[in-house]
Amino acid sequence: MLSVNLASLPIVEEMISRKEDLNIEVIKLENGATVLDCGVNVMGSFEAGKLFTKICLGGLAHVGISISGSLDNKLVLPCVKIKTSHPAIATLGSQKAGWSVSVGKYFAMGSGPARALAMMPKATYEEIDYRDEADVAILCLESSQLPDENVADHVAEKCGVDVSKVYLLVAPTASMVGAVQISGRVVENGTYKMLEALHFDVRKVKFAAGIAPVAPVIGDDLKMMGATNDMVLYGGRTFYYVKSDEGDDIENLCKSLPSCSAETYGKPFLDVFKEANYDFYKIDKGMFAPAIVTINDLRTGKLMSYGETNVDVIKKSLKFSQL
């Protein structure tokens, strides 16, 4: 059985050894846990964002960053590229932000390998039939505050490991690393919607790849939450190899997956969030999806695609001006 924590550990160790090059800080807590500050009190970097994203994906994906090859002159943004041969485990078993870490006054959304030890949430792991077994716990936290010993103790207890084997990576939404890792969820947005909204068995997805633009740092965490989500919803493009069973309606799956199927499509995410009174649970689940979905059905040989990118909404979200 693949271990997302053990697969991610060498990447964590690489980040620690390259901390100056990556513009990150490594902090050893008094209880022995290790914190990697990737953007709270440091600048971070694209390379740190790439490695952070690989860890979010449980070490089971290739991650790259480049400038888009498009020459349409509409908008030039860096892009993050993802590909994985283990889509269900990498995206839902690791990358999904499925752990609300709340300890005292500290709160962060947790994603990454440690979730597969703590089974956060249990239903997801039952759906994909996966659980990790490892003596090390690696958790990625989206927060503008660094965790303390109490948070590390909490994670260690939930994961059943010694606190000295806990690694906590932290990046605010409003940071370079934060922007990269959120755009790096482009494939996961699709598998999440497959499972949570369309109730499709994601274990049938055998390979997945995606690309999404990376938001520039344009403001505080709230503004960046809107911008980073828009990168995927209006700029994300994905490709899934699916081995269907007879009776699976893959054409309907493909049509239902992209963000354009949501009622709120066409508005910047921050506007939708405000209209929902800042309550994620009031937002149409269908909105959390890539802009374009392409599926190759390995059983039938059919290739199909649905959706479209929307540069105008991205420009509006970023308050972009062409000089």
From Swiss-Prot:
Gene3D superfamilies: Methenyltetrahydromethanopterin Cyclohydrolase, Chain A, domain 1 (3.10.340.11), Methenyltetrahydromethanopterin Cyclohydrolase, Chain A, domain 2 (3.30.1030.10). Keywords: Cytoplasm, Hydrolase, Methanogenesis, One-carbon metabolism. It is an enzyme of class 3 (hydrolase). It is found in: Cytoplasm. InterPro entries: METHMP_CycHdrlase. It catalyses: 5,10-methenyl-5,6,7,8-tetrahydromethanopterin + H2O = N(5)-formyl-5,6,7,8-tetrahydromethanopterin + H(+). Pathway: One-carbon metabolism; methanogenesis from CO(2); 5,10-methenyl-5,6,7,8-tetrahydromethanopterin from CO(2): step 3/3. The keyword Cytoplasm applies. One of its GO terms (cellular component) is cytoplasm. GO terms for molecular function: methenyltetrahydromethanopterin cyclohydrolase activity. GO terms for biological process: methanogenesis, from carbon dioxide; one-carbon metabolic process. Its EC number is 3.5.4.27. It holds the Pfam family MCH. The keyword Cytoplasm applies. Coiled coil: none annotated. Its main location: cytoplasm. Belongs to the MCH family. Catalyzes the reversible interconversion of 5-formyl-H(4)MPT to methenyl-H(4)MPT(+). This is Methenyltetrahydromethanopterin cyclohydrolase.
